[in-house]
């Protein structure tokens, strides 16, 4: 693909040049080619976007619930019509295989938008009788202008997960995509405008997180920040949001999730689940189950089943329908993952497979890392303690149920957890003791629109998806009505 035209900001229904004068490049990680130069939003651009959003939000919130619902449903239709085009752009920008982006990223994002479009008319207050002459009623009102700050691993899906409930509740959103993968968020802005969203209700500001993101979290005109990213960045976003104007926050942060295989499990099923929990999206999924706990007596057999399935991984041309494994999202990220692999070897973990870059003409110019499985791991190893966010699995052994629960919970993270067992009594007993916000039994990874998604401990605050997220983009106003004569004590 030839280099794209320079990408601008999207403010008030159209493209506009950044006043900052700064730019950055977005790279195709499969081959190292520059896709586009992208303009970076500065402080003045954030001010412009906030003013635009404030104007548009008043128009949007004044529309009836059904009018807003119809516009969002129209956007869903356009997303589905343009699925292949958007998936190709997402593949170029992220490096993910087209077989994945064409069936998951836009599809699931559109599902979430459709879900919230359907919930809009059900967003209602309540009536509370006090006595014969007085009652209270409540209204759920939009927050106003909110900010979404996205991660690089699911660019358009995250933009939809954040914008769908925000817009459904009557807010306007200013969205800052990751500077690593900014392209499809701009296309989403076009689609919202085409669907009839009033100008300013969805503005997109590409830029560097440490600058553009901080301008958003500092801005007094922003009522809430929804952030997806790492724990360290999340803490800064939360601190800035509180210090500036006590903004509400939703944080979807990192994870180091446990996947527990019990001794009664079908090992073929367990191996299939483990592969998806570690190597889907080349391991760049925040919920990945990278700490795989296996009974000691099952370890050897389980390892053989994993190795057999690693042979089925097909890396190569990311647009080949048979490819199911792409490069990492960037060269700096690849280098960071390789440092973790080297650390695992240094600390005594045994490499079962992988452990290096992929080599060959198809891989030499890209950010490719081989699917890597470590075994003979211990809980104190760096690769077991820290989030790697790449195709790196750690196999650990255990002897008892109590032991594995304790070790699974021995982490600052609490995003996800899963177990594989034929005993549903055991499944529920263990799941109820695991300290994680998203749990799976005999499956892994699905996050439907109806399912609240978020973490315990350092893995996040608040939830995305589900009914409660729509409510989190509103504020409750309580109104008391008195029909009898008011009595004053003065």
UniProtKB/Swiss-Prot annotation:
Entry keyword set: Metal-binding, NAD, NADP, Oxidation, Oxidoreductase, Potassium
Reactions catalysed according to its record: betaine aldehyde + NAD(+) + H2O = glycine betaine + NADH + 2 H(+)
Cofactor(s) needed: K(+)
Family statement: Belongs to the aldehyde dehydrogenase family.
Molecular function terms from GO: betaine-aldehyde dehydrogenase (NAD+) activity; metal ion binding
Annotated PANTHER family: ALDEHYDE DEHYDROGENASE-RELATED
Gene Ontology biological process terms from the UniProt entry: glycine betaine biosynthetic process from choline
Name this protein carries in UniProt: Betaine aldehyde dehydrogenase
Subunit structure: Dimer of dimers.
């Amino acid at each position: 693909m030839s280099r794209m035209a320079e990408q601008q900001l999207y403010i008030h229904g159209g493209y506009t040049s950044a006043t900052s004068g700064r730019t950055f490049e977005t790279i195709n990680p499969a081959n190292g080619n520059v896709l586009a130069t992208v303009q970076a939003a500065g402080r003045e651009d954030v001010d412009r976007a906030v003013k635009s959003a404030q104007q548009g939000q008043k128009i949007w919130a004044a529309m009836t619930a059904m009018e807003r619902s119809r516009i969002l449903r129209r956007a869903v239709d356009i997303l589905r019509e343009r699925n292949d085009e958007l998936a190709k752009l997402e593949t170029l920008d992220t490096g993910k295989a087209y077989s994945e982006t064409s069936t998951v990223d836009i599809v699931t994002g559109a599902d979430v938008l459709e879900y919230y479009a359907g919930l809009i008319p059900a967003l209602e207050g309540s009536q509370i009788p006090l006595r014969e002459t007085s009652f209270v009623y409540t209204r759920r009102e939009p927050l106003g202008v909110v900010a979404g700050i996205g991660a690089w691993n699911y660019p358009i899906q995250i933009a939809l997960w954040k914008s769908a409930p925000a817009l459904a509740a009557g807010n306007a959103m200013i969205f800052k995509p990751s500077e690593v993968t900014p392209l499809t968020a701009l296309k989403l802005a076009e689609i919202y405008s085409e669907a009839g969203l009033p100008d300013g209700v969805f503005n997109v500001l590409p830029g560097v997180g440490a600058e553009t993101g901080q301008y958003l979290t500092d801005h007094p005109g922003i009522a809430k920040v929804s952030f997806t990213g790492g724990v360290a960045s999340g803490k800064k976003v939360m601190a800035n949001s509180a210090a500036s104007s006590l903004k509400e926050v939703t944080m979807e942060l990192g994870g180091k999730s446990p996947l527990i295989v019990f001794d009664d499990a079908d090992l073929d099923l367990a191996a299939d689940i483990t592969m998806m929990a570690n190597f889907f999206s080349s391991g760049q999924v925040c919920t990945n189950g990278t700490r795989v706990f296996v009974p000691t007596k099952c370890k050897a057999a389980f390892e053989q089943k994993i190795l057999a399935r690693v042979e089925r991984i097909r890396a190569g041309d990311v647009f080949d329908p048979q490819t199911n494994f792409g490069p990492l999202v960037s060269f700096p990220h690849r280098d960071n993952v390789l440092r973790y692999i080297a650390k695992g070897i240094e600390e005594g973990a045994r490499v079962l497979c992988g452990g290096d870059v992929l080599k060959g003409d198809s891989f030499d110019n890209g950010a490719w890392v081989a699917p890597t499985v470590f075994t003979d791991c211990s809980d104190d190893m760096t690769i077991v303690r820290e989030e790697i966010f790449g195709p790196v699995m750690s196999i650990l052994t255990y002897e008892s149920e109590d032991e594995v629960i304790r070790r699974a919970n021995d982490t600052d993270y609490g995003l996800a957890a899963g177990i594989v067992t034929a005993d549903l009594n055991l499944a529920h007993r263990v799941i109820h003791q695991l300290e994680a916000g998203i749990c799976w039994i005999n499956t892994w990874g699905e996050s439907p629109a109806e399912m609240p998604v978020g973490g315990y401990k350092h893995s996040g605050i608040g939830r995305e998806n589900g009914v409660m997220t729509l409510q989190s983009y509103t504020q409750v106003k309580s109104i008391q009505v008195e029909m009898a004569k008011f009595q004053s004590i003065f």
